[in-house]
Curated annotation (Swiss-Prot):
Protein keywords: Chlorophyll biosynthesis, NADP, Oxidoreductase, Porphyrin biosynthesis
Protein name as annotated: Glutamyl-tRNA reductase
General function of this protein: Catalyzes the NADPH-dependent reduction of glutamyl-tRNA(Glu) to glutamate 1-semialdehyde (GSA).
Entry-linked Pfam families: GlutR_dimer, GlutR_N, Shikimate_DH
Catalytic reactions of this protein: (S)-4-amino-5-oxopentanoate + tRNA(Glu) + NADP(+) = L-glutamyl-tRNA(Glu) + NADPH + H(+)
Listed EC numbers: 1.2.1.70
NCBIfam families in UniProt: hemA
Site feature Important for activity, where: H103
Subunit structure: Homodimer.
Species assigned in the record: Chloroflexus aggregans (strain MD-66 / DSM 9485)
Catalytic residues, chain numbering: C55
Length: 453
């Protein structure tokens, strides 16, 4: 089974590259269909696919067809996002087989997050799986993989203290503001966005003393709901220039595909602040901008303006780096749980080696049973319906009893890594060459990533 992963994350690629390869919710259907549907007679790259795209990672999980190479996936990313492969290929990582399961389980557990142990990633993994399921690109392998990964995440959070005191990206952003500005009381804080990140930011701002919040979002109903919950002022998106002119701190986290704040927006806000000051000789006004979105909400050249301090998600490392040292013992326990879940998936995957041969064996047995039963019933034409049912039941029982030992033996052999050997023997004994060829195709292509390198 060609289980495959190609991706990049905050450890391999800066936000400038991650935002170029990010998949929006509107992108996902077409991207998943391109990965799993034939194109001009050519087979698709994958029989199953899930795309996990968050502010810190872009990953494609799939069951690859024979002939699919890592270069094919690089080409897909380049073509879909209209970016030259040379601009990002050096940031990609590739995994196969059990390593894919290990990576996803650790990811769902928060072990590969910028903010160690953060809980949001588990919901993001689930959302990615459900989105692919709605498109129809999830089959039995990725279904099993993602369910086991979600269990890994849940177990790590329940069986360790990794989530105790763990920050979120939002909390880290607020902590960054507190470190830069000190007391947040009396500061004008503008939150842009109406999703989970903004809500968590509002919670943490209030917990850190902020008492003057304004929320702006394209969907005014979501902004109004957040404002009501946290005692904030709500403004329509069209009032963003006005909100910027009042703000000391801006925390932005929308899902916009391009920036919503450009240099001229902040320049105008600073000019307005300066005009409103009674003191002509005062220092120029300052603004702290924290961009938690990927793709970024705030244009990078905004940071060139005097008095402006712009931070992205990649700048949060200084706030959260200490958590790795503080939780090293907990990480060891979490990794043990991850390994247990990986073994469970690997055991299940090995049993799948037996399925093509077992399916063909039962189909062949059923063909023989039907042929012989039809021949016998033609000769016993005086039987009543009840007698015919008895004979048919007898034939089924004989077949099931005969097939039970080899079926059990092959499943057990597969669970212990001997499935290929036993399946080959069984296929030869029962003349099931077609099943053997099918299995070989499903198990082949071991050079999937080697060809890339």
């Amino acid at each position: 089974m060609n289980l495959f992963l190609a991706g990049l994350d905050h450890t391999t690629a800066p936000v400038e590259i991650r935002e170029q390869l990010a998949f929006s919710q509107t992108d996902l259907p077409s991207a998943l269909l391109q990965l799993t549907q034939a194109d001009n007679g050519s087979p698709p790259l994958f029989t199953e696919a899930v795309i996990l795209s968050t502010c810190n990672r872009v990953e494609i999980y799939g069951v690859a067809n024979p002939g699919t190479t890592a270069q094919h996936v690089v080409d897909f990313l380049a073509n879909f996002h209209r970016r030259p492969a040379g601009s990002f290929v050096h940031t990609l990582y590739f995994y196969q087989g059990e390593a894919v399961a290990r990576h996803l389980c650790a990811t769902a557990a928060g072990l590969r997050s910028l903010v160690l142990g953060e809980a949001q990633i588990q919901g993001q993994v689930r959302s990615a799986y459900e989105a692919a399921q709605r498109i129809g690109s999830v089959g039995s392998v990725l279904h099993r993989l993602f369910q086991i990964a979600l269990v890994a995440g849940k177990r790590v959070r329940h069986e360790t203290t990794i989530g105790k005191g763990a920050a979120s990206v939002s909390q880290a952003g607020v902590e960054l503001a507190r470190r830069r500005l000190g007391d947040l009381r009396g500061r004008e804080v503008l939150l842009i966005g109406g999703g989970e990140v903004s809500e968590l930011a509002a919670q943490n701002l209030i917990a850190n003393g902020a008492d003057r919040l304004t929320i702006v979002n394209r969907t005014s109903s979501r902004a109004a709901a957040l404002a009501e919950r946290y005692g904030a002022e709500m403004l329509d998106f069209g009032a963003l220039p006005e909100a910027l002119a009042r703000a000391d701190i801006v925390i932005s986290s929308t899902a916009a595909p391009v920036p919503i704040i450009y240099r001229h927006h902040i320049a105008e806000a600073l000019s307005h602040k300066q005009r409103m000051r009674a003191c002509g000789d005062c220092d120029p006004p300052a603004m702290l901008l924290i961009d938690l979105a990927v793709p970024r909400d705030i244009a990078a050249d905004v940071a060139e303006l005097p008095g402006v301090y712009l931070f992205t998600v990649d700048d949060l490392r200084e706030v959260v780096s200490h958590t790795i040292e503080l939780r090293s013992a907990v990480i060891d326990i979490a990794n043990q749980i991850v390994e247990e879940q990986v073994r469970e998936f690997s055991d299940w995957l090995r049993t799948q080696e037996a399925l093509p041969v077992l399916t063909m064996l039962r189909q062949r047995a059923e063909e023989v049973r039907n042929e012989e039963l039809t021949r016998a019933l033609r000769r016993l034409h005086d039987l009543s319906p009840e007698q015919r049912a008895v004979i048919e039941g007898l034939s089924r029982s004989i077949v099931n009893k005969l097939l039970h030992p080899p079926t059990r033996c092959l499943r057990e052999a597969a669970a212990h890594g001997q499935g290929k050997r036993y399946a080959t023997m069984l296929a030869e004994l029962f003349n099931l060459e077609h099943a053997l060829e099918h299995k070989a195709g499903a198990m082949g292509n071991t050079e999937l990533t080697d060809r890339m390198r």
